[in-house]
């Protein structure tokens, strides 16, 4: 682990390669798993504000889940996560005619309809954040369904922290990211 400002960054974030390969996985991280995506109170409030833009594109099942239980629920560990359909699909996920999964929030953002890209936990994936005392742990979450992303990342020699530059800056700021890059460069120079 490396200490960068108020974070403890896992060595895997610097050493492991990763690059989403949507041609292979088709975005299955949005529709697999046993819980929704981690969500902050602020993000839930923002999604509540933009929900009228999203509702028309949500599936009938997703709208029913949101109506019945709301935008989020507490997972077994007590963490607030996005609501899911049929115990796996995020309520904001849709599948196109080619079987590709996409995020309705991100689609609306890219179309200029809203000013919120998506929850930071989704944007940062495969990094997960967790509280470690008064620090934030920044850790790599290894999931079997992302095997193709590890293969492509290795082929491209693209470490996780470089692949996730934009969301890391979004969450922690440019100064933090620059410091992370310095730590990574020093680590490489030492032949680690």
What residues fall within each predicted segment?
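Short loop/turn segments that flank or connect secondary-structure elements
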Residues: 1-192
